[in-house]
């Protein structure tokens, strides 16, 4: 079973950017959980985050209150948080 990674995107990111992040995580062997799929529903985003094994923070995440909240909640729940560089340094190996 692959690790599920929540994609925390600041407002202003396009759907194309959101799905590019999703594709990148998939290529690394992760199962992406894309906050863009929730159409701005912050409660749905937080529910999605709590069901994940990690959080991908997009560039400039700290400028967006919801992305900052996602990082704080994840850290409180001991869910690993990192940039693309972090997750790409730890790709999922086959069979995980």
Question: What are the residue ranges of the model-derived segments?
Answer:
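Conserved catalytic or regulatory cores that recognize and/or transform ribose-phosphate-containing ligands
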Residues: 1-96
């Amino acid at each position: 079973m692959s690790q599920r990674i929540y994609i925390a995107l600041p407002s202003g990111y396009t759907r194309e950017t959101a799905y590019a992040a999703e594709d990148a995580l998939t290529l690394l062997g992760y199962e992406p959980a894309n906050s863009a799929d929730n159409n701005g529903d912050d409660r749905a985003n937080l529910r999605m985050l709590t069901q994940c094994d990690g959080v991908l923070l997009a560039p400039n995440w700290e400028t967006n209150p919801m992305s900052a909240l996602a990082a704080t909640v994840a850290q409180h729940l001991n869910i690993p948080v990192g940039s693309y560089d972090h997750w790409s340094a730890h790709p999922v190996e086959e069979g995980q």
